[in-house]
Amino acid sequence: MLCLSTLVLTIDNQVLTVAIPVLVQDLGADSQDIQWIGDAYILTTAGLLLTAGSLSDRYGRRRVMIIGLALFGLASLLAAGAASSGELIAYRALMGVGCALVLPSTLSILITVFDDEERRKATSVWSSVLMVGMIGGPILGGVLVTGFGWGSVFLINVPIAVLAIIAALALMPESRAPARRADPLGAVLSMVGLTVLVWAIIELPVTGLTHPATLTRLAVAVVVLIAFAVWETRTASPMVPLALYRDRDFSGGSFALVLTQVGFGGLVLVFTQYLQFVLGYTPTQAGAMMVPIALATILTNALGATLGDKIGNRTMTAVGLTVVAVGFALLGSLSPDSGVVAVASALTVFGVGAGLAQPAAVAALMNAVPPEHAGVGSAVNDTMQQAGGALGIAILGSVLAANYTSAMPATAPEPARTSIGDALALGDAGLAHAAREAFSSGMAITCWATAALVLAAAVLARLVMKGRTTPTPQRVTAEV
């Protein structure tokens, strides 16, 4: 059941990436619309995760997850029939609410329901299904978009969500934390602060860092989040136990994952466009090219979990992130003439690093969380990764766009200088060649910058996280 819940979210995130070119054609979506189709989902998910995690601890993790699955399925059904970009953005925001309710519950249930021995088996199955979603999602998305249109990438969520709800009702025991007072003020402050913060990050590429609107949003976010932190340290029943950050494994693991997610967010944005616009792959072919990264992660996930127990989560996290950085460097060496082998090799190295690092990093983080705060602890992890992904899209997307524009000929039409899709649509062979070269140049700079960022995450993990002390069983889980 946990696998089905995770699967529906994984598939949704993967299938949409290959539908972007079709959405541009069918809905007349411009670049800002495309950004908000993805960002509306991120905005509501990140803004509500902490509150959702607290609700799952208080009112029952199974109950909250079922409500989230039902909402996610309904929103997916509505999204499939959207007649405009605005409608689709609204329904994607509603899907984000459902996702926020589901995500903390799955990881917290895995921690609280299973004992140490069962948890290892459950995590192994859960991680494998997650990778099946990553492998099958892009391929399925390509087939659906090509054969049935973009709406089908949302309709596929509905039967999976229904099956997950049925399985939860039939098979899953309810779990909740001991009763404690609610923290409504903390919930409001966290929702407002996180939503405004992610909104500011999302709008960075459009407004720039020094724009008054950006500065206002950032100021509001900082003030509200400081108020949230102060309140949480003074209230008798805090929604989020901030003392968790005094644990070096929790703080080191979470911040390392944030920096890594910045890189992952940029990878999804850049690489899907590279495959389709530069190499000319169909949506199905672009989806299939994600198979190497998923397979590599599956094969190394169990190894990373096992070695994490033996040599320590700190070392395993640092080694894995270093390998991820090498993968980004290899991606930065790709060109418009790169073949399948070069692309697959770079993605395989990336997947190996992710499979080694993430189980150890998340294990260290979640082992620091008391069982009664499992939902909130999971939500903190999810929130920071969502914020990192949004930051990656904003910053690395801006780096890519700026370098693409600067590399294009000054005599090119203005739309072609800002969008490779517009450049290719003009049908000029010389302009198309220049656009592909410019995009590859921008991608190289972006990937090298990301490699440096992930390497910094490896150093952070090594310096901050605690070394292995006693061979206690680890609560291992992987998110990719």
Description of each model-found segment:
Residues 1-45, 149, 186, 198, ...:
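Transmembrane core module of solute transporters
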Residues 119, 159-175, 193-203, 221-234, ...:
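C-terminal membrane-cytosol helix-exit motif in multi-pass small-molecule transporters
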Residues 60-69, 85-86, 105-106, 114-124, ...:
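C-terminal module of multi-pass small-molecule transporters
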Residues 46-47, 77, 135, 191, ...:
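Hydrophobic/small/kink-forming positions within alpha-helical transmembrane segments
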